[in-house]
Amino acid sequence: MSNKKDVAVKISGGKKIREAREKVKSDTLYNLTNAVERLKSASYVKFDPTLEIVMKLGIDSRHSDQMVRGVVNLPAGTGKTVRVAVICKEEREEEAKSAGADLVGSTNIIDEIKAGKINFDVCIATPDMMAAIGSVARILGPKGLMPNPKLGTVTLDIKNAIKNAKSGQVEYRAEKAGIIHAGLGKLSFSDQDLLKNLNAFIEAVIKAKPAGLKGSYLKAMYLSSTMGASVQIDLTSIA
């Protein structure tokens, strides 16, 4: 049976949620600046939530020529600690370690992946290791961890790849319904830093518009915070 203290906590929590929801109007379109301000004022959780973006694109991702995918280097970073694994030959392991990689190796890492031990957020590989990594493609692929030259994670420039991954590089990929979702920093960031990240991400997605696409590309955009409110963005305010 709940005691009076538990009941008081539940009432207090419910009140905070109601007050937060009242600060955001579901039938209103916001520009990016106002959206960030509203989400901050409406946040009620005790942890530092992530600012999340959802973009609805007018594409059919079932067609190979309408795939939208890429990476963005966020100017203000993500606010997260990123664990980077580098799979390379022995002669380049020291270089990877010096550049800040958290996990460095070759077939030993591949064996760990096969055993289900995946304790990294980004996997970088040199081209000469890709044949061996192919044996774990079905494991890494669905998790979004498979090294890819288009994303800069299959490269000879190990140092720069590690730097990008650590400094706030975010991958985006349109899902079947043309939806792109990404976290773009912590709500504790300054408004200016969040807007820098938002503008960099939106610009990258817009530039990735398929050349042969007919009709409108950007259909809708929403911003939200973890366990918080969601606001719709006025697309006419996007430069």
Curated annotation (Swiss-Prot):
Q: Does the keyword Ion transport apply?
A: no
CDD domains reported for this sequence: Ribosomal_L1
Which positions, given as ranges, span the membrane?
none
Gene Ontology cellular component list? large ribosomal subunit
Annotated GO biological process: regulation of translation; translation
User: In the UniProt record, does the keyword Phosphoprotein occur?
Assistant: no
Q: Which PROSITE patterns match?
A: RIBOSOMAL_L1 (PS01199)
Q: What are the alphabetically sorted keywords of the record? A: Repressor, Ribonucleoprotein, Ribosomal protein, RNA-binding, rRNA-binding, Translation regulation, tRNA-binding
Its domain of life reads Bacteria
**Molecular function terms, GO-annotated:** rRNA binding; structural constituent of ribosome; tRNA binding
Q: Which Gene3D superfamilies match?
A: 3.30.190.20, 3.40.50.790
HAMAP family linked to this entry: Ribosomal_uL1_B
Known role: Binds directly to 23S rRNA. The L1 stalk is quite mobile in the ribosome, and is involved in E site tRNA release. Protein L1 is also a translational repressor protein, it controls the translation of the L11 operon by binding to its mRNA.
Task: Give the quaternary structure.
Answer: Part of the 50S ribosomal subunit.
The UniProt entry, under PANTHER family, shows: 54S RIBOSOMAL PROTEIN L1, MITOCHONDRIAL, LARGE RIBOSOMAL SUBUNIT PROTEIN UL1M
Q: Family assignment?
A: Belongs to the universal ribosomal protein uL1 family.
Its protein name is Large ribosomal subunit protein uL1
Q: What's the source species for this entry?
A: Rickettsia peacockii (strain Rustic)
Gene name on record? rplA
